[in-house]
Amino acid sequence: MYKFLVFSSVLVLFFAQASCQRFIQPTFRPPPTQRPIIRTARQAGQEPLWLYQGDNVPRAPSTADHPILPSKIDDVQLDPNRRYVRSVTNPENNEASIEHSHHTVDTGLDQPIESHRNTRDLRFLYPRGKLPVPTPPPFNPKPIYIDMGNRYRRHASDDQEELRQYNEHFLIPRDIFQE
């Protein structure tokens, strides 16, 4: 019985190796993903409403409005009664400052906003707008005529006439041998 078990286990191993099958081992399966949390207005009652609180005062939110975060981390110290367009520290990021700034290179454009990198204007090269895309001419192949050599004849008499013409041109006449 012991020999049979050893023989059968070796046979199973050889069979699995010969058939190139891999036995699927249990692997790590990630935990199921949680659905997104959708909160209702009842759950967000204690948190500040950032955009409109009923007083209709046009001001930007600041960290002082937040109940948990301390107001000391607001190191920029923005005025809450003023709305800022882009950046307070760098006025070059604002489009209004670009319009009023003086460019060193005049590119000849009507609006200086279009020339952020002093690029060339190519409108004078292509006045019509879009250029037509060149396309190759249509491919119309010429028909090829093959001389079939009168392969398809209507009557058998045509073959006899051709054979008679062949004999006249290429065969030796009989009267030469009769002398």
From Swiss-Prot:
Tissues/organs with expression: Hemolymph. Produced in fat body.
Compartments it resides in: Secreted
Keyword tags: Antibiotic, Antimicrobial, Glycoprotein, Immunity, Innate immunity, Secreted, Signal
Signal peptide (residue range): 1-16
Top-level taxon: Eukaryota
Function: Antibacterial peptide.
Protein name: Lebocin-1/2
Organism of this sequence: Bombyx mori (Silk moth)
